[in-house]
Amino acid sequence: MKMLCWRLALWLAAWAVCGKPSFCSALDYDYTYDFTEEDKAEAIDYKDPCKAAVFWGDIALDDEDLKIFQIDRTIDLTQHSNERLGHNTGGFGEHGMSKKRGALYQLIERIRRFGSGFEQNNTSKGRTTVKFSGKNEKNRFPRAATSRTERIWPGGVIPYVIGGNFTGTQRAMFKQAMRHWEKYTCVTFIERSDEESYIVFTYRPCGCCSYVGRRGNGPQAISIGKNCDKFGIVVHELGHVIGFWHEHTRPDRDDHVTIIRENIQPGQEYNFLKMEPGEVNSLGEPYDFDSIMHYARNTFSRGMFLDTILPSRDDNGIRPAIGQRTRLSKGDIAQARKLYRCPACGETLQESTGNFSSPGFPNGYPSYTHCIWRISVTPGEKIVLNFTTMDLYKSSLCWYDYIEVRDGYWRKSPLLGRFCGDKLPEVLASSDSRMWIEFRSSSNWVGKGFAAVYEAICGGEIHKNEGQIQSPNYPDDYRPMKECVWKITVSENYNVGLTFQAFEIERHDNCAYDYLEIRDGMNENSPLIGHFCGYDKPEDIRSTSNTLWMKFVSDGTVNKAGFAANFFKEEMMCQPDNGGCEQRCVNTLGSYQCACDPGYELGPDKKSCEAACGGLLTKLNGTIPTPGWPKEYPPNKNCVWQVVAPTQYRISMKFEFFELEGNEVCKYDYVEIRSGLSSDSKLHGKFCGTEVPEVITSQYNNMRIEFRSDNTVSKKGFKAHFFSDKDECSKDNGGCQHECINTVGSYVCQCRNGFVLHENKHDCKEAECEQKIHSPNGIIMSPNWPDKYPSRKECTWEISATPGQRVKLTFNEFEIEQHQECAYDHLEVFDGESEKSPILGRLCGSKIPEPLIATGNKMFLRFISDASVQRKGFQATHSTECGGRLKAETKPKDLYSHAQFGDNNYPVQADCDWLLVAERGYRVELMFQTFEVEEEADCGYDYVELFDGHDKTAMRLGRFCGSGPPEEIYSAGETLLLHFHTDDTINKKGFHIRYRSIKYPDSVHTKK
C-alpha cells in the first residue's frame, strides 16, 4: 500500500515521530468523574491513556515524545487562561489538567529546553511557529505509509475485555458499537482469550479516552467514563482504537472549515491546531464533514450558540452539519477499509438468516476476484450454511478457483472445507457463532459461480470448558416466539459455573411470559435451579455435576434486550473433607466458605463453630433481649435471631427498652432488623444510641434480628417483644405481581406507575405511555416511579383544564439523566395540545425546575429515555391558575370563572385578569351564559369588572355582581380586559361567559 488515508495513516506517522500518541476524548464531553473504591480494584495492568506527561490537543505525550515531536503553533499561547478548562458540549476537566497556563505550555517549554534540531521563527502579533530545521526534517520523519505498520491490528482482529464495573446495559451497548464497526468494515472484535495485545473497556478519570491504534506488548485501555456510555461516543472511541484521529486536524482543513478563535474558551485554543503536511497523507480522500471523528460546531465554545468550527458553504450555499455521533459516515467506512485492506467484494452478515453469492451470479464471475463474507450471529447460536448453487472451475486440490469455509472469525480459523467444481457441498455447521467464507478466482473459465443461504440456530449441545451464551439477537431485543435449549458439558470431575453479565427479560413475578429456565443436569427433568426473568441479574450458578441445562423462551408480545452469560468449568472446593469446616461448607465460584447452623457462630479460625446468642424462634410471640440483660451486654458479640411465623402471617417488633453505644452512624454497636432470614434480606433499619425505634413489621412471615458489639464500650442493651398477625398478602404477595394492599377480610392488587392491571386483577403489564388528563389538578409521574424509569420509553401527557384557566406544572421531585443540551433522557413541556405547540422547556438533570405555566387551558408533556442511563425520574403536580391572554375568534369560545365550575363554588381571595384580544378590525363580544356572584349594592365584595382596553387605565365598562349584566357587552376596540375579584367570605357558583370577535362599527358597548 503506497499511501494511507490521512486520518488512519496519521497514527502511523505519529508513531514514527512520537512512539506514543494517545487520544483522550474527555476533551469532547463535559462530564465529572466520581472515583470510588470499586474502581481501584481493576486487576488488569493495562496501559492507561490518562497517565501522560502532557497533552497536545487530544494527544498524550511522554518525555521521549517531547524531544522529537513537531507542531504547527499558529496561535498566541500567551493569552491562555489560568482557569479550569472545559466547554459547553464537553470539558477538559477529567484529565486533571487545570494547571496554570495549560499543559501545552509544558510541551513548548520542553521543546525550547531541548533546542537541538529545531528552528523557532517569530511571526507578527507575537505568534510563534515551532518546526524542525530542514536538515533534520527529512531524517526524523519518514513517510507514514511504510514506517510502523505494526500499529495496525493484525488481520483486523481486535481482542477485547469489558471491565467488571459496567452494567449489563452498558456492556450490551459496547457490543452494539463493535458490531457497528464490524458490519461496515473488515475489522473484527473478539473476546480476548490468550492474545497478548488487546483493549480493555474501563472507567478512568479522563472520561472518554483511548490510545490511537494498536499499542502492542499487552493490554491498552479504552476509558468510557461517567456519562460517556452513549452508542455514538463509544463508536467514536473505537475509531481511535482502530486508527482514526480527528478530522479537523488534517493539514487541508482550512480549505473546508474556519476556526473562529475568539469564540474558543480561554486555554483551549491548542485543541484546534492542525497537523503538518509532512506528517500525514490524505490519499486524495475528500474532507469528511459527516465523519463521526469530527468536532461539533460549538466544541470548546465560550457559549452554546457560538461557533468554534464553521464549515464552508457547499455549492448550494448550505453549511454542512458536523459533529454527528450516531453512525459511521461513508468516509469513515471507506478509509477504514483502505487501512485494513478489506476486499472490495463480500460483506459482514449479522442477521439470523441471509444469503450471498459470487459476483455476477448467475451470469459468471470475473477472473482474479477475491471476496470475503463474515457471518456473525449471537454467541450461543450456531451457523448452518447451505450452498444452493455451485459452478466453479474445477482443478486438482481446488487450486485456482475455490471457496473456503472456516469455523471461526478469520482466515486462520479451522477449515470446514475447500470447494470447487459443480458438486454441491454438504450442509456445513459452525461450532460457534462465527463463520468465515473466502472466494478466490484466478482462471479465465466462465461459470455461474455460487449461491448460498445461512441460518442461525439457537441452542444445541456444547462440549467446552468455557464459553459464552446469549439470548438470540443480543445485544438487540430478542425475537418473539423463540425457544432455545442449551446442554452444556465440561470435563469430568468438574462442575459448570455460570455468571451473568447482563439480564433483561420481560418482568413477571411468576415468569409466565418470557423466561430463562436453568436445571442442574442434562435434560428438562433435572432438578430445577431457577426460572428467571425481570431486570435483576441472577446470582452466580454452580451445577453439582459436569452438565447444565438451559432453556430460553419468549412469547409474541414484549421483547427486551435479553441476557449474556459466561460458563466455565468449576472445581467443587468443599470436597472431599467438607473444606475443613466444622458444620457447613458453602461452595462459591472459585472458592468456598464455612458457615454455622442457627444458634452458632464462626470462631476466630473461620472454620469452627461455637455457641452463640440468637437462634431460631417459631412461636407466635415472645421476647428478645441482648445477652446479659438487664446487665450490660458483653463485647465482641454477634447474635442472630431468626423469627419464623406460619404462612400468611407477618411479624411485628416493638422495643420496650433501648440503649446501645453509638449515635446516628451506628459504626460500633448496633442491631439490624430485616424481612427475611438471610444477611442480605430487605433491611428495615440499623439502630443504636438511646432513641427507641418505632414498631417494625416484616414484609413476610419471617424476620432476622442481628446484634453486634465491638470490643470497647458496652451499654445495657435492649429488650424487645415480637408478635405475629395474619396477613393475606404475605403468601406469594397475594398473587399480585407488583403491590398487594391489605383490606379488611380481603386484599387488592395494585400496579406501579407505567403499568396496568391485567384482566385477572393480579398481573401487571407495561402500559402505553399516553395519558389524557381532564382533572383540574393531580399528580404526574415518570414511568415506574419512584423506581428508576425504564430505558427506551416515550410517554406523553395531554392536560386539558377548564376553558379560561391556565395549566400550571409544579415539580416536587426531579432526577433525569444530565446533559447540557438534554440530548439523551429529557422531559419536554409544550404550551398547547401537542408537541407542535410552542415549547415551555426541555428539562433534564437533578435540579428541580421552576414552575411552568401555560398561556391557555392546555399543556402537553413528552418524556423520552434512551437505551443507557436511567434515573429516578420526576413527580409533578398539575393545577390551574385563572387569568391570561385569550384570542377572540369568530367562532364562540368559553370562559369559566374557576377550574371547578359546576362542581364547587369559586375560591375566596381571588384576583384574576383575562385580556381578550380580537384581530384588527374586529371587536370583542361577551355573552353571559351563567352569572352568580355575591350580591352587594355597590358590588364591593365579589365582582366582575370590565375595561374597554388592554389594562385598567382604559374606560371602565362596568362592575357587575349578583346576577350580572342583563345583555351582551361589546368592546369599542380590539381588546377587552375582564377582572374578577373575590373577598374572604361568601362565595357563589361563579360565571360562564362565551366570547367571540365580530365586526361592529359603532362605539356602543351594550346591545340596545
UniProtKB/Swiss-Prot annotation:
GO terms for biological process: cell differentiation; dorsal/ventral pattern formation; protein processing. It is found in: Secreted. GO terms for molecular function: calcium ion binding; metalloendopeptidase activity; zinc ion binding. Zn(2+) binds at residues 236, 240, 246. Its EC number is 3.4.24.-. PROSITE patterns: ASTACIN, CUB, EGF_2, EGF_3, EGF_CA, ZINC_PROTEASE. GO terms for cellular component: extracellular space. Residues 27-143 form a propeptide. It comes from the Eukaryota. Residues 1-26 form the signal peptide. Pfam families: Astacin (PF01400), CUB (PF00431), FXa_inhibition (PF14670). Its main location: secreted. Disulfide bonds join 186-342, 206-228, 208-209, 345-371, 398-420, 458-484, 511-533, 574-585, 581-594, 596-609, 613-639, 666-688, 729-740, 736-749, 751-764, 769-795, 822-844, 882-912, 939-961. The active site is at residue 237. Its cofactor is Zn(2+). Binds 1 zinc ion per subunit. Residues 345-457, 458-570, 613-725, 769-881, 882-998 form the CUB domain. Gene3D superfamilies: Collagenase (Catalytic Domain), Laminin, Spermadhesin, CUB domain. Residues 144-343 form the Peptidase M12A domain. Glycans are attached at residues 122, 165, 355, 386, 621. Protease which processes procollagen C-propeptides, such as chordin, probiglycan and prolysyl oxidase. Required for the embryonic development. Predominant protease, which in the development, influences dorsal-ventral patterning and skeletogenesis. This is Tolloid-like protein 1. The lineage of its organism: Eukaryota, Metazoa, Chordata, Craniata, Vertebrata. The gene is TLL1.
